[in-house]
Amino acid sequence: MNGNRPNYISLIFAALVILSLFWLVRSFYFDTSAPSKMSFSDFIQMAYEEPTRIAEVVVRDDGILRVTTKRGEYYEIYAPWFMQDSETIKVLSEKGVRVTGEKGVSSSFWVNVIGNVIFIGFLLFMFFFMMRTISGRNNQAFTFTKSRAQMNRPGQARVTFKDVAGVDEAVEELKETVLFLKDPGRFSKIGARMPKGILLVGPPGTGKTLLARAVAGEANVPFFHISGSDFVELFVGVGAARVRDLFNQAKANAPCIVFIDEIDAVGRHRGAGLGGGHDEREQTLNQLLVEMDGFDVRQGIVVMAATNRPDILDPALLRPGRFDKKVVLDTPDVRGREEILKIHARNKPIAEDVDIRVLAQRTTGFVGADLENLVNEAALLAARNGRDKIKMEDFEEAIDRVIAGPARKSRVISPREKRIVAYHEVGHAIVSSLLPNADPVHRISIIPRGYRALGYTLQLPAEDRYLVTKQELLDQITGLLGGRAAEELIFQEVTTGAASDIERATELARRMVCQFGMSDKLGPLSWGKTEQEIFLGKELTRMRNYSEEVASEIDEEVRKIVTESYDRAKEILTKYHKQLDELVELLLEREVLEGEELRKILKTELGEEMVNHDKLRAAAGSEQDS
């Protein structure tokens, strides 16, 4: 409720201003008690010719006559000589007119003066009270040209390189920046110049902001943090003014670090878009370029910025002398994920059954923010279940929640639909388990999760991969189509549950043909040109650069890949129909089936054939290692 108090004060102040204006206008223009002016000759004529019209005459010692008629009319006449005109006073008295005397200044005058002074004083008090309230809220009403940067002083919530993991190369790159901030003379002695700007590039959540804070923490210098969107406002020129103010603050607190997060909000390529771009944003960018040229790196100011869209930044921003060093933060590998998990878990009570190495292997593709969220989700689950330590099952459930969404056990599914979902998921699992290049199955579940998923089959790669072979892609497409193949094999009809699988399989097959050159018929050619459309604000689009005949051949090749993979999936499930039925019954009973249990059952059922498959998978893994 405290946040609404300034709004109430503003409303009260506005109401008082309106009432005061109404009162003043009414007093000056509509006051019926205000006297009218009358000449002395008109008064003498009325006194002698129409004395019956006059009700009262008040003679003031300052020479003012106040004449009131019987009709309620009120007149004022300035006639200081009237006090000596005894004849007229006698005539009025004889005609029954009341004639009285009064002091020069009436008490009503002082009442009005005092009332106005009190009212104006109250308005001034309210005005200064509002100004004080606004000043307490960072004086936002009058300092919109000031920089919005948040300044962290040395020692305040200090972050160091010990709090950063999974980006060892980036840390090594930035250690020399720390040395420069601690001892600039060490570099100037040998004529070395530190980069004026350092651009941190990487996907969202990889720790760009954290790494910038760690550099400031290691160097123990002030840290200015501002978002690129904080520069541009409604008013023209505000962005450029804020840039100037930011660098003035930095110069006053040197040595320091200025960190601009999401710099693409203000540093986008100039002139992009219809109409030539955004003038205010470009003016802000121009001022930023000028400021980066204007300061001497020997002052100890290092400008750092972060973006996940380096392709749309203006070239002038990236030239030497501005952001002349790029530091790339990539998705962490299994070792990096393990170190990140250890950092986030070090202040939490972890049970003895938790294996951080296994969790790192099962979180392929997770970035630092995902892993922090994973640990926090596991802690929440442990607290919800009344445990004082976080167990491995909490982490497993947290992984499922992050990947597929929270379980929705309250959703009512008919027995027939539940059986269809079970066959669909087991179809995925069996096909993927029997393909030598598919990712191992980690878990099968028919518990609804997230928005629309009625079940899921979670496959996690055994290790990080940076290259994918053609056969691995084909096995992946075949595994995606295993669910639909099981539905058609068992129920002789298909459902809408495979829509997402078909979409992913088709897209993967099209990329194999058009992007990876993996079509035997069309050969190692790239079809479709990736361009940056200037009229789309430098957005990536894929332009068609081939004929209608080639387009037809591409569609035919995509159809061939998907159809052959689908037939292959049906062939596998037809051959292992018995195992499919047994696993479905087990899954319907338990609702969740772990990957290890699945492989154990298949090895028991298939014997030597499953052993040979394990050898094929191991051989594929050793080829990747080489």
Curated annotation (Swiss-Prot):
Residues 1-7, 130-626 are cytoplasmic. Residues 29-108 are periplasmic. It is found in: Cell inner membrane. The keyword Cell membrane applies. Keywords: ATP-binding, Cell inner membrane, Cell membrane, Hydrolase, Membrane, Metal-binding, Metalloprotease, Nucleotide-binding, Protease, Transmembrane, Transmembrane helix, Zinc. Coiled coil: none annotated. One of its GO terms (biological process) is proteolysis. The active site is at residue 425. GO terms for cellular component: plasma membrane. One of its GO terms (molecular function) is ATP-dependent peptidase activity. PANTHER family: ATP-DEPENDENT ZINC METALLOPROTEASE YME1L1 (PTHR23076:SF97), METALLOPROTEASE M41 FTSH (PTHR23076). In the central section; belongs to the AAA ATPase family. NCBIfam families: FtsH_fam. Acts as a processive, ATP-dependent zinc metallopeptidase for both cytoplasmic and membrane proteins. Plays a role in the quality control of integral membrane proteins. Homohexamer. This is ATP-dependent zinc metalloprotease FtsH. The lineage of its organism: Bacteria, Thermotogati, Thermotogota, Thermotogae, Thermotogales.
